[in-house]
Amino acid sequence: MVSFISISQGVSLCLLVSSMMLGSSAVPVSGKSGSSNTAVSASDNAALPPLISSRCAPPSNKGSKSDLQAEPYNMQKNTEWYESHGGNLTSIGKRDDNLVGGMTLDLPSDAPPISLSSSTNSASDGGKVVAATTAQIQEFTKYAGIAATAYCRSVVPGNKWDCVQCQKWVPDGKIITTFTSLLSDTNGYVLRSDKQKTIYLVFRGTNSFRSAITDIVFNFSDYKPVKGAKVHAGFLSSYEQVVNDYFPVVQEQLTAHPTYKVIVTGHSLGGAQALLAGMDLYQREPRLSPKNLSIFTVGGPRVGNPTFAYYVESTGIPFQRTVHKRDIVPHVPPQSFGFLHPGVESWIKSGTSNVQICTSEIETKDCSNSIVPFTSILDHLSYFDINEGSCL
């Protein structure tokens, strides 16, 4: 159990925390565009298409214990550097509001400079670090912008596609449905772009500010589709509250537009839900495959255990996760609690054009893991100069 109290500047992770505290036994209440109904577990819901057994096979790659050492390795290395240069992490940790999961909420002024972190072409377990191309950065920026639109009340629940980021990234977008749950405030929408030939499924993240937060619990729940896989109980519960609202809508859109691709995205908690949704779509909808289904997350937390991470990798579904500088959220729940990121990481190291890609499909000690435990809540609020958490 980890606790921290109010943050004087920046955002709290209020909705993220509510999901972290939400157990699988919670009673979910959800609704589509203002209506309300009771949702049940996605894994047990007869209204959903059945699981495709061949798409739920446990991963053959069992990984290694070293996969869970990337973050602890850098925490020790960077803490030693910090203390050898006169810093005192022990004094920072004396107040619960300074650390969460061992990570700093507010960056110390004398933290190790980010320039000491991984550089391009450096080797690590399972891949290398390369510089993102201009085209790749434009793509990452686009999905950060689309994820930001979910914070606009005019979009969810307003059903209006008229915000600044809306018109910038998908000018011909048509909202098919919005969805929301009352218990965990899970929100999102399904959007179609005929020019881009794309069906978007977008989840809203955290947007509550300056609140007191205590007793974050990192509980696992069995991930029923895949033997041995476990995911965060709160993330799964919050996701399951809305699956009935969006799933048939995506299916209807695929039937009407069979050549369109499906892209799932979200920021913060929305990133966790996007990953779960992407896997659910792949496991139940035979028309979707790595050729027409992709997942892009922005500042998303860790979702599951190593078996879940290796399973996501084994599906072949393209999964790109973007992390801004020292954003703390991608480092919770901590690796030390048994959580592991799947996906190719794109790390905004500085500015908006210095972006590194860790090519491994499982997180390594490079990219954003290279700066722990010196993280910051402020870097969670902006990606590629796009405000995340507010509609601007």
From Swiss-Prot:
Gene3D superfamilies to which the protein is assigned, alphabetical: alpha/beta hydrolase
Keyword Lipid metabolism appears in the UniProt entry: yes
Record field: pH dependence: Optimum pH is 6.0-6.5.
Alphabetical keyword list: Calcium, Cleavage on pair of basic residues, Disulfide bond, Hydrolase, Lipid degradation, Lipid metabolism, Metal-binding, Secreted, Signal
Active-site positions on this chain: 268 (nucleophile), 327 (charge relay system), 380 (charge relay system)
One Pfam match: Lipase_3
Cellular compartments per GO CC: extracellular region
Keyword RNA-binding: no
List of residues binding Ca(2+): 379
Annotated localization: Secreted, Extracellular space
Cited function: Hydrolyzes ester bonds of triglycerides as well as of their derived partial glycerides with a strong 1,3-positional specificity.
Family according to the record: Belongs to the AB hydrolase superfamily. Lipase family.
Protein name (record): Lipase
Species assigned in the record: Rhizopus niveus
